[in-house]
Amino acid sequence: TLEDVDTEVGAVRRGSVETIAVSPGGRPVYAVRYGEQDELHSQANYNSAVAAKNPAWYARKDATTRPVVLFLGPVHGQEVEGIVGLVNLIHVAETGADHRGRPWPELKRRLEQFRVLMVPSANPDGRARCPYDSFVGVPTRTMTKYGQGTRKDGTLYGWPGAKSVHPMAGDVGILGAYFNDDGINPMHDDFFLPMADETRAVLRLAREEAPDIAVSLHSHESPPMILQASYVPVFMKERIRDLSVRVKERYEEVDLPYGDVREPRFDDETPGPTRSFNLTSALHHVSGTMAFTFECSHGSLGERAASLTHDQILDVQLLLYDEMLRYVLENRLYW
């Protein structure tokens, strides 16, 4: 819950906490930081630096600098699994153990080698409107009702129908947790002229911190999986594919399911378009980060659902975070 987020960030002692935005509903969006920030020696924004043939004009990354990781909590309020994961990751950073009391010594050790950025809940308005704290054992249709919302006659907007009206307004019975209280879905904001303060704050955070890797945490009914970002360089898609293989293998070691490993592909080779430049894409283009979307499993009941317990969902989250850190430590890009 948002109260759990407030409690956890209020107990931060080893890091720092900042309110980077206030939602239309008056709720804080927190950024939690661990580790020192290195001097970036920045003299250009990322786009201009790339045009100058050297991204180091935006941020110098070499063996003397600390790698940076950005964990972006759910921008869709019903996708609570990422909030659970990040609340527990903060607890690991502070105590070395998750809220079950399970120690994660290697994860904590790796965290201490990074500049760590966490936004536990990127859409607190949506989270506040969602009446469920978990969808484990709950029909997927119920999750869809409160996640994407309904029309006035009670019919579901569903996916991708909930993206066909934006900002979401007008024929609305239940305003889905996809949206903040102004009806903005941060995943599909106007990134060159953002409508939501939450979106602006997240992009500003990435712009100022230059993360080496960034994940946007989401959830669906299917097995967990990494999704490729659209409209980013092929070499970044190859790195995301390589990470996906590693995460899949890590899950298989402990009998956790994983979906498809998505291979790099060109976007919209035939008329459409059908691929969107979303928040994950924008994170790359504002900072050069290796950005991807991670879909956890809700553990809901449906035809495609992955039957996961609460314990397994937390393991899915924390093992992902650990593998992200391992990947960057072993495969960091220097500029």
Q: Language-model segments: what does each one mean?
A:
Residues R33-E36, V75, A122, D190, ...:
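A mature extracytoplasmic/lumenal domain signature
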Residues R66, V80-K237:
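Active-site/substrate-binding loop(s) of hydrolase catalytic cores
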Residues V17-A21, H99-L107, D260-P264:
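Surface-exposed patches in mature extracellular/periplasmic domains of secreted proteins
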Residues E3-V69:
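Soluble metallo-hydrolase cores and metallopeptidase-like ectodomains found primarily
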Residues F71-Q78, G82:
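Active-site histidine-acidic residue metal-binding/catalytic motifs
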Residues V17-T19, Y58, W104-E106, V202-R204, ...:
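Generic recognition of flexible, low-complexity loop/linker segments
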Residues A169-W335:
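Metallocarboxypeptidase
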